[in-house]
Amino acid sequence: MKTKTSKKPAKTARAKSQPDLGVAHLVVRGEDNFFAIDPKLATFERARFVVISAGFAATVTYGGGTDKGPKAIHDASQQVELFDEMFGREHILEHGVCTLKPLNCKCDGAEINRRIYEVARQVVAAGKIPILIGGEHTVSFGAVKACWEKYPDLSCLHIDAHSDMRDEYHGQKFNHATAAARINELCSIVQAGIRSREAYEPGHPDRPVHVYHAFQYRDSGTWQDEAVSRLSRNVYLTIDVDGFDPSVFPATGTPEPGGLSWYTGLDLIERACKTRNIVGFDVVEVAPVKGSHQTEFAAARLISRIIAFVSQYCLSKNTL
């Protein structure tokens, strides 16, 4: 009895004094990490970027398979060249990317966001940038909340085909169709690529939602600067891959015709990075299909481009 009694307080004290203990035991060891980089560059202590995988797919209402998205993107990332042809640098090696083991997603939407929040909170507290990979769009709220708590002026740049502004869907507050509504409870949002929404989606009166529909900017080259101007200094970037044209990301649960081209989407993201501080981002709704690697590879490539933009523009400002 004495031995058991003496051990319990020690465990409790250790957990309280080391809040990053939960992240430490999740770190992937060895070379099977995101981008297959040198393990020395993939430790939690060394890396500036931290990958959180959440293959949650409990509220899917059309095409399935998003639960397999994180693993497919992870595998595809190991085929991505690390040299950035635009900047002539290897930002991924310069700053390091830590990969965490996939989260247990056998739960409901509220619980998975609680789990993501607990991990992302420790990542953000350590001065690192969380990269959340879904899974369906339901998962974004937990990471946004973690960033919002550290950066109270946070706003969200939301690339998507769908506005996701329903207050609830199929009786659920946490659903892939309510992702932006939950985020809007915390901060204002700028949406781009939208081409599917409800007639009435009010949003929060004190936290506006600025919508850039796909049809409005198809012939315009100036909308990106206007969109970025509506963002606050600190920004969370959430990307549903169906915000891009299906020719770029064909394997997704609810594809819509039209959308951002590859370079139009990258241009918007780069402009945001140039004048704002990206403190976290996610890529969601990849639903791999057998016989094609196009979508998951494009998603891995997109993540590498965002890392390059954040490294080149945001980290150079020493703003995190």
Report the location of each language-model feature:
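Polybasic, lysine-enriched low-complexity intrinsically disordered terminal tails
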Residues: 1-14
